[in-house]
């Protein structure tokens, strides 16, 4: 993501849309919806990082076809510094399966940070 996200713009299960795209081979990632659609069957590896700043916190979920597959927590809730959390999730996908990252059920404070100091990210690749 190229900009900070104010916490007051989040809602439970709101998809994170990563607008800064370095590589999108096959165009499987949709930069409008924030969702990755598997172009074929196989084992895929996904990595995500989320940063909270200045007394903020947020749980985030890696979701496959509406089912939570991984959860992270970036928690700077009791200090005015950064807190970064990341996940690496290996998933067996069928062609057409959809994976995305969304806000979890716990969040508060001022904002999630994504700027020149730290960047929220979502990446992945097909293993087999």
Q: Where are each of the predicted segments found?
A:
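Extracellular jelly-roll beta-sandwich "head" domains, especially the C-terminal globular C1q domain
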Residues: 1-128
């Amino acid at each position: 993501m190229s900009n900070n996200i104010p916490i007051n713009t989040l809602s439970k299960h709101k998809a994170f849309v990563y607008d800064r795209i370095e590589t999108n081979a096959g165009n499987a990632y949709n930069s409008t919806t924030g969702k990755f659609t598997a172009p074929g069957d196989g084992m895929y590896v996904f990595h995500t990082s989320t940063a909270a700043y200045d007394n903020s916190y947020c749980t985030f979920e890696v979701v496959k076809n509406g089912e939570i597959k991984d959860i992270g927590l970036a928690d700077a809730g009791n200090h005015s510094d950064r807190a970064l959390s990341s996940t690496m999730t290996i998933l067996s996908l069928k062609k057409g399966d959809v994976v995305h990252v969304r806000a979890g059920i716990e969040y508060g404070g001022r904002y999630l940070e994504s700027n020149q100091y730290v960047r929220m990210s979502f990446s992945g690749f097909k293993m087999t």
